[in-house]
Amino acid sequence: MKKIILGLLMIFVGLFIVLYSCIKNKKITPVQFPDVAIQNFKFPEDSTTINQWLSKQDTAQIISHSWGIWAGLTEPTNQKYNGQTLLVFETWLGIQEIANSSNNNTSKINRTALNVPKQFIHGALKDPQVIDTTFQVLETVSYDPWAANFAISNQLLTGSKLRSYAVSDGIGSIPDFPNASIVTKPTYYTGIPDKNSLIRVPVWVSPVPAKAFRSSDWKTWVYADINNRQKPNKILVPVTSSNPSKKEIENATCNLNEFINYKLDEEGAEYLNLHEDFNSTTYKDGDYVLLVAMHVATKEIKNWTWQTYFWCPDPKNPPSPSSKFAADLKPKELKGAASHYAVSVAYAMVWPNQPITGGSDKNTRPIISFNPYLEGGFGPKVFNYPNTYKPEFIYGMQTNCMSCHALATYKGTAGYTTDQYIDMKNLKLFKNDIQLDFLWSIQGNMDTLK
């Protein structure tokens, strides 16, 4: 009888292991951007419509559209990983997964690995102060299925294929991505809970005047309660002391579920410990990473649309580069953690909007759009390309996503720029180089040996 019971127990354990393995290794299938039930929102929007918004400088329409994009990206799917429901953007392939794929419609078996933001590395080549030896702000760069399949089909991460687009004494360029393409840069804060189950998170305060201001220098924090014991959506008062009182901590504490977040699994924790943080905390299965920011570009217009989102303690009154005007346009359909983020947009480089080529900075106004967690720490040494429009623009807080990404080329020699108009047919700037359709992620991840 004991042998029978022992045998049954072994069978049960074996079945459990097999079942767990199947669940653990279930594929994550990238999903298309969903239909979002928000009035007057359409994706992809017709380029003619967006260009009309630009002609009218209709920032209300532009911001409303960016909120619709955010709603779609953060919509829950019917897929789970490590017990957590995946949001739309979380199902998409990371850039290295795309680089390693030879077939369209590729799935993945894990969450995309987190890495130090490429722009931190690029910036550090010019200014070592951009980063230090420990990283708590980490990113992924992911492409939606349209963009991923296009990159794979056209071998856009293969050096020899990219070089085939070169034009002698001219400007080469890769093919334009499809108009439904979306590229995202989800950016996470990695923190370990203290003895009270609280994760301390730096929050942006938008200093005046502009300066190089890394998240490690902000000295303003909120706390995320991993047990979600706080009153939902309470008014937060961030702490500014390194040794706050119990009451100050209480007033600065929100629930973890007011951040988009996920739990590290064993593989994710091991990856971080091996690759990212050399002198700091050891991560383990079950630790949390919190989404604090995300750059998003869509190919709805020639120069792509650019919007960036960041978490803020008071989403109804976000700091610059967002605004109360932008917050007031947030649709009522956007709820939960996703509603706790602010938005900044750059659908043009300057106002009035300029043509792809033949435009000018003369008599224009700057459009400032950056992400505090990404560009906030950039100082003068980071920007290679001189700003002839506003020479005083020397900080990350004076940038525009479109202007900077216009300089994405195979050689990458122009580097980064602060906000100004970039003529895409500027032979002096782009001669004998290959434009990468505004995507620095191609330049940063291409295999030049293939």
Annotate each PLM feature:
Residues 18-21:
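C-terminal motif of bacterial Sec signal peptides marking the signal peptidase cleavage site
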Residues 1-4:
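Positively charged n-region of N-terminal signal peptides that target proteins for export
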Residues 6-13:
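Sec-dependent N-terminal signal peptides
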Residues 24-403, 408-450:
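Conserved small-residue
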